[in-house]
């Protein structure tokens, strides 16, 4: 008879959790930042607020965003005007839209990841799904499992209302699942739609205006497993360690409150300083065990909360400009897609590395870091190890 220890050892994988495929998706509707102020004030029936529109236009100009993809269209706003009004009761219709579209958009990214992986979907043992909006029972994880035709025995984890740091949270969760369940293949999906936060402008809510200028819709997916079979699977990044911390006395720095009017967004002006002043401690704790203290020796996957956050982190750590290129590219092309962003950036980095004929998926470097920042103020830190782009 086997002992508990022998049984547990047999349950565990031998190697580190590894990302085996990545997929991303966006809605079809694209908005361009250069004329978004005109669009936004027109569809919210706010063109009479000329001074506020000028202020919003300046926010858009400084956002470093070229375009975003947004599910909500002008036709939908005409049909449901309360969504576009400032603080009008509208949660019911927002929920109707979100609970249908969040899993559908997640499916689009998941299908791309599954196609790249190339293995039967029946081999997916676990599903980890996160979104900032659309809480219901059964949840988006259940709907996605059905949309994809996953096995009814798939073990699901659903994370709601985590916010922008959750791209790190889902990787941390997937790492634990993959490494503690031999043979596990974990499908991770982040799907974000801004229908829950969209509303008209107000002089009394400038932090809400910042959110209207930054956030976009998108979904991303990865497949994670330990001990990959390299004859049929292609490793991309290893998940070496993962940690979460929150900054004391910063509970309201980034916040969202779900009310009859939807999800309201709140942001302290000093968020870039709070993050930049605390990020090096996270780096030190993560990389001291590896003997790494040169932050420019790492490849960087940082959540693009906004240009001010990226600038502050870059300056505080004396990072070379190229370190945040992949992050800035995703911000420019898609905006801030909350939890989905960091997986978009991972995808951009591996593609850029292959296109540039770099030696590894991490732009030729071995070690990297993935950061998620969000409500709490919470920081997720994931240590990554790249893999060679060419195998012998």
From Swiss-Prot:
Question: What are the catalytic residues?
Answer: 164
> Could you tell me what reaction this enzyme catalyses?
4-coumaroyl-CoA + 3 malonyl-CoA + 3 H(+) = trans-resveratrol + 4 CO2 + 4 CoA
* Molecular function in Gene Ontology: trihydroxystilbene synthase activity
Instruction: Provide this UniProt record's keywords sorted from A to Z.
Output: Acyltransferase, Cytoplasm, Genetically modified food, Plant defense, Stress response, Transferase
- GO CC annotations, alphabetized: cytoplasm
Could you tell me which Pfam families the record lists for this protein?
Chal_sti_synt_C (PF02797), Chal_sti_synt_N (PF00195)
Highest rank taxon of the organism: Eukaryota
Which EC number applies? Answer: 2.3.1.95
Enzyme kind, highest EC tier: transferase
Where is substrate bound in this sequence?
A: 55-58, 267, 305-307
Tell me the pathway: Phytoalexin biosynthesis; 3,4',5-trihydroxystilbene biosynthesis; 3,4',5-trihydroxystilbene from trans-4-coumarate: step 2/2
Which GO BP terms, alphabetically? Answer: biosynthetic process; defense response
InterPro entries attached to this UniProt entry: Chalcone/stilbene_synt_C, Chalcone/stilbene_synt_N, Chalcone/stilbene_synthase_AS, Polyketide_synthase_type-III, Thiolase-like
What does the record note about the induction of this protein? Answer: By stress, including UV light, ozone and pathogens such as B.cinerea. Strongly induced by ergosterol, a non-specific fungal elicitor. Positively regulated by jasmonate (JA) and methyl-jasmonate (MeJA). Induction by phytopathogen attack decreases with grape berry ripening.
On assembly, the entry states: Homodimer.
In the record, the note on similarity to other proteins reads: Belongs to the thiolase-like superfamily. Chalcone/stilbene synthases family.
Outline what the protein does.
Mediates resistance to pathogens which are sensitive to stilbenes such as Botrytis cinerea, Eutypa lata and Plasmopora viticola by enhancing the production of phytoalexins. Confers resistance to Phytophthora palmivora when expressed in papaya.
Q: What is this protein called?
A: Stilbene synthase 1
Species for this entry: Vitis vinifera (Grape)
């Amino acid at each position: 008879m086997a002992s508990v220890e022998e049984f547990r050892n047999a349950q565990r994988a031998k190697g580190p959790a590894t990302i085996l495929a990545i997929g991303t998706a966006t809605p079809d509707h694209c908005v361009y930042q250069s004329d978004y102020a005109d669009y936004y004030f027109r569809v919210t029936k706010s063109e009479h607020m000329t001074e506020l529109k000028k202020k919003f236009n300046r926010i858009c100009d400084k956002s470093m965003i070229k375009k975003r993809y947004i599910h909500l269209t002008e036709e939908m706003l005409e049909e449901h005007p309360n969504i576009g009004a400032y603080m009008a009761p509208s949660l019911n219709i927002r929920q109707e839209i979100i609970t249908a579209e969040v899993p559908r958009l997640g499916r689009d990214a998941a299908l791309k990841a599954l196609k790249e992986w190339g293995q039967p979907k029946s081999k997916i043992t676990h599903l980890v799904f996160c979104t900032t909006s659309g809480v219901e029972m059964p949840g988006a994880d259940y709907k996605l499992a059905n949309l994809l035709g996953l096995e009814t025995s798939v073990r699901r984890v659903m994370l709601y209302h985590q916010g922008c740091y959750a791209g790190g949270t889902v990787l941390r969760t997937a790492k634990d699942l993959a490494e503690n369940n031999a043979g596990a293949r974990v499908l991770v999906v982040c799907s974000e739609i801004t229908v829950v936060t969209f509303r008209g402008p107000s002089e009394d809510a400038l932090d809400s205006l910042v959110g209207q200028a930054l956030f976009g819709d998108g979904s991303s997916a990865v497949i994670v497993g330990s001990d990959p079979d390299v004859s049929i699977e292609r490793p991309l990044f290893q998940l070496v360690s993962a940690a979460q911390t929150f900054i004391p006395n910063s509970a309201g720095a980034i916040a969202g409150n779900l009310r009859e009017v939807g999800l309201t967004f709140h942001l302290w002006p000093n968020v870039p300083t709070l993050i930049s002043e605390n990020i090096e401690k996270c780096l030190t704790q993560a990389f001291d065990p590896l003997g790494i203290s040169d932050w420019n020796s790492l490849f960087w996957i940082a959540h693009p909360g906004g240009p001010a956050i990226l600038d502050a982190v870059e300056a505080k750590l004396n990072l070379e400009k190229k370190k945040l290129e992949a992050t800035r590219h995703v911000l420019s092309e898609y905006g801030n897609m909350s939890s989905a962003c960091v997986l978009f950036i991972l995808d951009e980095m591996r593609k850029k590395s292959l296109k540039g004929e770099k030696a590894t998926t991490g732009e030729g470097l071995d070690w990297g870091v993935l950061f998620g920042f969000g409500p709490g103020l919470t920081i997720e830190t994931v240590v990554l190890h790249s893999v060679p782009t060419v195998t012998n």
